[in-house]
Amino acid sequence: MVLETERLILREYTWQDFDALYALLSDPVTMQHYPKPYDEAGTKRWIDWSLQNYQKYGFGWWAMVLKETGEFIGDCGITMQRIDGQLLPEIGYHIDKAYWRQGYGKEAAKAVRDWAFTHTKLDALYSYMTAGNVASYSTAAAAGLKKVKEYEDPEDGPLYVYAITRVEWKELQVSEGEQGLF
C-alpha cells in the first residue's frame, strides 16, 4: 500500500522503521498529548499492531516519508479506535516536531481520507483528540472533518471528536472541484 501526495509518500511500516518511529514516539514534545511517550516495547507494539491491522482491515498506521529525500517524518493512517464506547475508524497523524506547521499533517490526512472513501466501504471517518490539542483538531478541520462531539474520558480528560461522512466527502470533492472516484 502506497499513497503519494505532492510532497509525501505514505507506505506500510516495516521493522526497518523501528529506530525512526522510536525517535518520534519517545519524544516528550511530539507526544505531549499522550499519557506518556512510548518506550521501545511500546514502539514494537505500534509496528506489530500496524502489521496486524494491514492484514485484518487493509489499513493501519502508514509511515510518512518525504518524497524528495525518503526521510521518515511521522505517520498517518486509519485505525479502529474506541471512541466514547464505540469502535470507529479514526484518521490519526503524528508528525516529527521538526516538521510541524508545514502542512504535512493536512496533506497526509486529506490523502488518507480520500483513499478511505475510494478504497473501502467505510461510511464515515473520525478523529479524536484531547481538548488542548489545537494542532490535531486544526488538522482534522483542514481535512474536512467537523466537530461532532465532546466527552469526558476518565483517563484523558475532555476529548473532542471530529467526523466526516462519505456523503459529506462527496460534497467536499465537488466544492473543491476535485475529481474523486465515487
Where does each model-flagged region fall?
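A short helix-loop-beta-strand connector motif used in the catalytic cores of GNAT acetyltransferases and
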Residues: 50-63
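Secondary-structure boundary/capping residues
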Residues: 30, 39, 56-59, 125
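Conserved GNAT-fold acetyl-CoA-binding loop/helix
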Residues: 29-49
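Acyl-donor (CoA/ACP) binding surface of acyl/acetyltransferases
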Residues: 1-32, 65-182
